């Protein structure tokens, strides 16, 4: 088949092991594992949390809805902020807000159901977009042929946290009753916040990322105006030579 277009390039993706992943971005590695432990606990046992508080079935369904829907709503604004500022700073802020909201659930959650929903919603708003920011931070340090393998390895790390989270938090909920869920979350956020703060101080910044420069999408093909301008310039040069 005759065509002016070149054949697509087929290249084998570079394999990224767990060691390579941590070497590329310790923040992404620990962040994915830590937030996986949070997801496995908070999203897996939030209904159990409500049941142990003595909530009705309808109240538990509202609690589960808020815990999921509010986080989904904040995916875009948090992502926009992470594209504007240093992603490590955004991750640190998310950690701090999640830590404070977890403590507030423990202290004020028993006051009323509406207050409980408020702080669970705040926790969801900052915890659910966390993993997306972690992935974006990792991609800042990768070559094109590393993205697929690194993403799959990061998913594995996150899945390990998802598996361990419910197992560990069950012990907390057995000892501290319902609020053991958020005692557990608070402890995980403390470690994540400390590690993130350490990476902010000593970690490297991606060469392709400049927090003071807004991102710009560049088309892979030339626009019609650009093609017309280039054509006119070529014609004028030919006329000059003649």
Residue spans for each PLM region:
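C-terminal membrane-cytosol helix-exit motif in multi-pass small-molecule transporters
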Residues: 1-10, 192-200
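Pair of pore-lining "gating" transmembrane helices in MFS-fold secondary transporters
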Residues: 22-41, 121, 125
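Intrinsic disorder in cytosolic terminal tails and internal cytosolic loops
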Residues: 10-13, 199-242
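Structural signature of the two symmetry-related core transmembrane helices
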Residues: 89-104, 186
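Loop-to-transmembrane helix entry/capping segments in MFS-fold secondary transporters
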Residues: 57, 142-154
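Intracellular juxtamembrane helix-capping segments at the cytosolic ends
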Residues: 128-142
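A membrane-interface helix-boundary motif in multi-pass transporters
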Residues: 171-189
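Helix-to-loop junctions at the C-terminal end of transmembrane segments
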Residues: 75-86, 173-174
């Amino acid at each position: 088949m005759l065509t002016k277009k070149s054949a697509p390039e087929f290249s084998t993706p570079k394999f990224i092991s767990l060691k390579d992943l941590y070497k590329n971005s310790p923040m992404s590695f620990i962040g994915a594992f830590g937030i996986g432990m949070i997801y496995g606990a908070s999203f897996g046992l939030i209904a159990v949390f409500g049941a142990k508080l003595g909530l009705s079935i309808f109240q538990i369904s509202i609690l589960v809805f808020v815990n999921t829907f509010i986080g989904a709503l904040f995916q875009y604004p948090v992502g926009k902020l992470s594209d504007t500022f240093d992603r490590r700073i955004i991750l640190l802020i998310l950690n701090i807000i999640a830590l404070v909201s977890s403590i507030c659930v423990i202290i004020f959650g028993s006051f009323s159901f509406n207050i409980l929903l408020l702080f669970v919603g705040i926790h969801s708003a900052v915890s659910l977009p966390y993993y997306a920011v972690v992935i974006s931070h990792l991609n800042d340090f990768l070559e094109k042929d590393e993205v697929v393998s690194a993403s799959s390895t990061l998913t594995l790390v996150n899945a390990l946290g998802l598996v361990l989270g419910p197992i560990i938090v069950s012990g907390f909920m057995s000892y501290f009753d319902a609020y053991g869920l958020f005692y557990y979350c608070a402890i995980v956020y403390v470690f994540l916040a400390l590690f993130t703060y350490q990476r902010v101080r000593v970690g490297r910044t991606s060469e392709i990322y400049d927090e003071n420069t807004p991102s710009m999408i560049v088309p892979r093909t030339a626009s019609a105006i650009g093609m017309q301008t280039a054509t006119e310039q070529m014609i004028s040069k030919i006329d000059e030579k003649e």
